[in-house]
Amino acid sequence: MNQAVGTQILTLTGLRFDANLGILDHEKAAPQPIQVDAELRLGVQPLAPRDDDIGHVLDYRRVRQIIIDECKAEHVNLLESLIGKLAHRLMQLPGVLGVRVKIAKLEIFDDCEVAIRIETGQW
């Protein structure tokens, strides 16, 4: 009997924390709040895992921690630099075929947020 399959995408939405990011004096002086959204395309997977064991799937706790660690590792001047570094790191996870990431500076301006989005790999 054939097992049913579907395309699986792991999504983390609205992950908020402070990071050292930016070129403005106040950005260099203190961390600022950012928000990260990430989608990881895992490709065709069984509709249900072969068993109920976390060791046989991509653990979203690990993905969350990688995002936080990469974004907090060091001061980065540009959103473009940070998102490229993060997307590259997420693409290295086992089974990941494609990555979509968005990083937003939440308080850079009084009247809006500023964000950048990148997509890499297979979609």
Segments predicted by a language model, with ranges:
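N-terminal, polar/charged subdomain of small-to-medium soluble alpha/beta proteins
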Residues: 1-123
